């Protein structure tokens, strides 16, 4: 069989139920439930040791399943040998055969096809991954990006019913990784490929995935589309992993806070005359409906964008969030009943200490001196309730 795309018309896809993988006393995968629909690309995202690769390897049959079920189209795969599962595998280093040319590498899994059909499939795969005419190239002459494209072509050539990719781009530099992530997404969509993809890189995950699953300590914390995951991280663990600042029950995505006006009397920057500075943006009722004060702790330049680490009052931030239209504690409580009293007065009445100043990151157009007082605005579109 030499289809140009994976046949997903009658498939129900991958089902993982209560999956556990153990290494001695270590529970690397701890009761994970996961569904991957036919034609869907699900990316598992997590730090090193989160269990994402162990989960993928268990699905592939490369790790023993301590508990739970792995099924394809409703049929258990737990006792099915690796080579009979019909799954394709691609790893970080590509694992190309250096003694074979590019065409022979891609044709490796096509031994059941006549020679002419093998050649046609190899050419088709090279076109798909953007390397037409590379059949006779020596593997040792390929760049890192070209080698990973060939590895992807080899994995796709037999039209696997499920493609498993374990950190396929992590050995490449960031610029190439960003380009290839976009290309991989296009290639998988074009072929209608069902895929489970593992990475520690958030940008890569958000580019490639239909849905992203965040893992920590062997557990799947959250699984959703990239858009909804950013809009509703769901927990402080997920929010922090995604790079959000967490202040109380608010998750602030990068860019949620911005410096919009320098307070009077801020020390001038080196080379400036005088001790006051101009506002970063005009503060008018139309452009600045609600703000809160903060103190700059440090400034840094990251990827061409100035950031200010600031100290602010979490209760003032919560009030600003409500002013900006985010649901307040009462609304978040919903049908579960009224929210517990909050605020300084409620804290004192309950014997709790009032909320202390906390740190967050704000975007700014220029560096600010440590100790400078600034005014911040909040972007509701980059802010979520937890």
For the regions a protein language model found, what residue spans apply to each?
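Short coil-to-helix segment of the ABC ATPase nucleotide-binding domain corresponding to the Q-loop/switch region
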Residues: 100-107
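A short, proline-enriched helix->beta-strand linker immediately N-terminal to the Walker B motif
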Residues: 157-161
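Non-catalytic connector elements of ABC transporters
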Residues: 251-386
């Amino acid at each position: 069989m030499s289809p140009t795309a994976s046949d997903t018309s009658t498939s129900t896809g991958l089902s993982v139920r209560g999956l556990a993988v153990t290494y001695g006393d270590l529970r690397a995968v701890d009761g994970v439930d996961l569904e991957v629909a036919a034609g869907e690309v699900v990316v598992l995202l997590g730090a090193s040791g989160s269990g994402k690769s162990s989960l993928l390897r268990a699905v592939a049959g490369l790790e023993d399943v301590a508990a739970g079920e792995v099924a394809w189209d409703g049929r258990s795969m737990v006792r099915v040998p690796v080579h009979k599962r019909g799954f394709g595998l691609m790893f970080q280093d590509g694992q190309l055969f250096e003694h074979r040319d590019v065409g022979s590498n891609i044709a490796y899994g096509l031994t059941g096809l006549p020679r002419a059909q093998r050649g046609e499939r190899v050419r088709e795969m090279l076109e798909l991954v953007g390397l037409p005419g590379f059949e006779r190239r020596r593997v040792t002459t390929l760049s890192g990006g070209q080698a990973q494209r060939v590895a992807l072509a080899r994995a796709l050539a037999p039209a696997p019913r499920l493609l498993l990719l374990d950190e396929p781009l992590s050995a490449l530099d960031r610029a190439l990784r960003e380009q290839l992530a976009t290309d991989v997404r296009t290639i998988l969509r074009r072929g209608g490929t069902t895929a489970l993809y593992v990475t520690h890189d958030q940008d890569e995950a958000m580019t490639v995935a239909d849905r992203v699953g965040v893992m920590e300590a062997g557990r799947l914390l959250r699984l959703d589309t990239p858009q909804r995951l950013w809009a509703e991280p769901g927990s402080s663990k997920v929010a922090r992993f995604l790079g959000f600042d967490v202040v109380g029950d608010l998750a602030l995505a990068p860019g949620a806070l911005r410096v919009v006006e320098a307070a009077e009397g801020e020390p001038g920057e080196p080379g400036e005359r005088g001790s006051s500075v101009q506002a970063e943006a005009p503060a008018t009722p139309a452009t600045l409906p609600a703000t809160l004060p903060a103190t700059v702790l440090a400034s840094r330049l990251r990827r061409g964008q100035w950031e200010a680490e600031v100290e602010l009052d979490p209760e003032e931030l919560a009030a600003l969030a409500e002013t900006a239209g985010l649901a307040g504690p009462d609304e978040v409580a919903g049908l579960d009943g009224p929210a517990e009293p909050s605020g300084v007065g409620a804290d004192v009445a309950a014997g709790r200490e009032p909320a202390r100043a906390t740190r967050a990151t704000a975007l700014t157009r220029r560096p600010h001196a440590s100790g400078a007082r600034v005014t911040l605005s909040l972007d509701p579109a980059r802010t979520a309730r937890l």
